[in-house]
């Protein structure tokens, strides 16, 4: 009985196929339905392709505008269209700093921003969006950033009010300090040393100052 039922179904399908092949009304209807389905699919696919193309054109236009104008605004920070502090300030002559002198250059009391790493003082004014009063690393402005960079700490606990000789840092942390020092040397102007208590500042000639700046350029 099951086999018979199966035979009926198979024969019925076969008959339908033959009728379709003979051009019977059932076959014509199936063909028309298939044609309609294909046409609808093509229409939908074409519409989707058109929408994708339009979106791609809009994104391309937006990207070109960003490349031309967005980067400029991003680099200039909040004062878009205005010169950055680094652009308006003359290059700082090389000199040495005590902790008290260094603290004056925090970006708030003066537009110039300095910080120290491993006994070296760097002018980071051109990175004011990072080291300025509102920047994510503004806590280091006008301070010795060595301990904070070595311990990855952005809290006031990483700052010392007195000279920090870093003697309690381990070998890995000191290596990190030296790596940070090298990175700052590559990116920012080295403007002098951070003086230890009682240490006298060095006198730098114009020739030494020019030579150091030439190396950095």
From Swiss-Prot:
The chain crosses the membrane at residues 40-62. Keywords: Endoplasmic reticulum, Glycoprotein, Lipid-binding, Membrane, Nucleus, Phosphoprotein, Proteoglycan, Receptor, Secreted, Steroid-binding, Transmembrane, Transmembrane helix. Expressed in brown adipose tissue, white adipose tissue, liver, heart, skeletal muscle, brain and adrenal gland. It holds the Pfam family Cyt-b5. InterPro entries: Cyt_B5-like_heme/steroid-bd, Cyt_B5-like_heme/steroid_sf, MAPR/NEUFC/NENF-like. Residues 96-195 form the Cytochrome b5 heme-binding domain. Disruption phenotype: Adipose tissue-specific knockout mice adapted to 30 degrees Celsius show no difference in body weight or white adipose tissue (WAT) mass but have reduced brown adipose tissue (BAT) weight relative to their wild-type littermates. BAT loses its distinctive reddish color. In contrast to wild-type mice, which activate thermogenesis and preserve body temperature when exposed to cold (4 degrees Celsius), mutants rapidly become hypothermic and die if not rescued. They have a total heme content reduced of about 60%. The modification Phosphoserine is found at residues 84, 98, 202. One of its GO terms (biological process) is adipose tissue development. The cytochrome b5 heme-binding domain lacks the conserved iron-binding His residues at positions 131 and 155. Non-classical progesterone receptors involved in extranuclear signaling are classified in 2 groups: the class II progestin and adipoQ receptor (PAQR) family (also called mPRs) (PAQR5, PAQR6, PAQR7, PAQR8 and PAQR9) and the b5-like heme/steroid-binding protein family (also called MAPRs) (PGRMC1, PGRMC2, NENF and CYB5D2). Interacts with PGRMC1. Interacts with AAAS. This is Membrane-associated progesterone receptor component 2. It comes from Mus musculus (Mouse). The gene is Pgrmc2.
């Amino acid at each position: 009985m099951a086999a018979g039922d199966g035979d009926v179904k198979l024969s019925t399908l076969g008959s339908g196929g033959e009728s379709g092949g003979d051009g019977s009304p059932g076959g014509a209807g199936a063909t028309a339905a298939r044609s309609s389905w294909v046409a609808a699919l093509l229409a939908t696919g074409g519409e989707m392709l058109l929408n994708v193309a339009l979106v791609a054109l809009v994104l391309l236009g937006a990207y070109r505008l960003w490349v031309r104008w967005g980067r400029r605004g991003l680099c200039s920070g909040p004062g878009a269209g205005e010169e950055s502090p680094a652009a308006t300030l003359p290059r700082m002559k090389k000199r040495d700093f005590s902790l008290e002198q260094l603290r004056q250059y925090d970006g708030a009391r003066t537009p110039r921003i300095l910080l120290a790493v491993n006994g070296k003082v760097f002018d980071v004014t051109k990175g004011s969006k990072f080291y300025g009063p509102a920047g994510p690393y503004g806590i280091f402005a006008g301070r010795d950033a060595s301990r904070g960079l070595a311990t990855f700490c952005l809290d006031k606990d990483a700052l010392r009010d007195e000279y920090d000789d870093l003697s309690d840092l381990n070998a890995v942390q000191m290596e990190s300090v030296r790596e940070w020092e090298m990175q700052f040397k590559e990116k920012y102007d080295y403007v002098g040393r951070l003086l230890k208590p009682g240490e006298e500042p060095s006198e730098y000639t114009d020739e030494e100052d020019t030579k150091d700046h030439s190396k950095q350029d």
